[in-house]
């Protein structure tokens, strides 16, 4: 559903890359990659991937993917500095995708259009799962709700970012939070994002970053 909706081609992801090439992702800029020497390369250091943000963009260029098309892959990573809980572990098995856009597409309205297409694919998947397993009942709302991290802070000023997310999701069922990574009115970020490739400063039509 998702690969068809977004016009994505499957590619195989690396488990590790050579250190110093700038391919491995820095995540929030402080996480340490797992490294090991490769004997037949003169003990050159390799790094287990953190994520594939940079690699995916190199792959798009290598395959000369046209705007409106992209790639998806199954990433296996180790994150030694991950804060462990019931949702996060040292080992990451994550489906990842990236698509080519034009300079003119770098707008909040385009972002929200892509999110709606992704959510539509999720709804179709939910429908198919419920058809295949009648004991399941659909629970997702028909539409996804968009909200800026600053508006979320204004709504729930006494809650932590995670508690705000829980509260807004209980209210709307499916939510996309914008502006993550930039400082809010309380001087804090909603959450950490990569300074290398994440964009939290594109101006929306309503004037918000």
Question: What is the predicted role of each segment?
Answer:
Residues 1-209:
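Structured aminoacyl-transfer and RNA-binding surfaces used for tRNA recognition/handling
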């Amino acid at each position: 559903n998702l690969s068809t909706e977004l016009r994505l081609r499957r590619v195989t992801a690396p488990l590790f890359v050579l250190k110093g090439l700038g391919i491995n992702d820095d995540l929030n800029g402080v996480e340490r990659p797992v490294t090991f020497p490769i004997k037949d390369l003169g003990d050159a250091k390799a790094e287990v991937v953190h994520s594939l943000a940079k690699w995916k963009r190199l792959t798009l260029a290598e395959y000369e993917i046209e705007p409106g098309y992209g790639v998806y892959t199954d990433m296996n990573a180790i994150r030694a500095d991950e804060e462990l809980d019931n949702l996060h572990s040292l080992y990451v098995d994550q489906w990842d995708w990236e698509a080519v856009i034009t300079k003119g597409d770098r707008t909040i309205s385009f972002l929200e259009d892509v999110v709606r297409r992704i959510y539509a694919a999720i709804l179709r998947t939910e429908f198919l799962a419920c058809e295949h397993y009648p004991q399941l009942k659909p629970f997702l709302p028909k539409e996804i709700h968009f909200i800026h991290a600053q508006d979320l802070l204004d709504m729930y000023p006494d809650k932590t970012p995670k508690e705000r997310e829980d509260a807004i999701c209980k209210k709307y069922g499916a939510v996309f939070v914008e502006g993550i990574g930039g400082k809010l009115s309380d001087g804090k970020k909603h959450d950490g994002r990569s300074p290398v490739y994440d964009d939290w400063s594109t101006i929306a039509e309503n004037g918000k970053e």
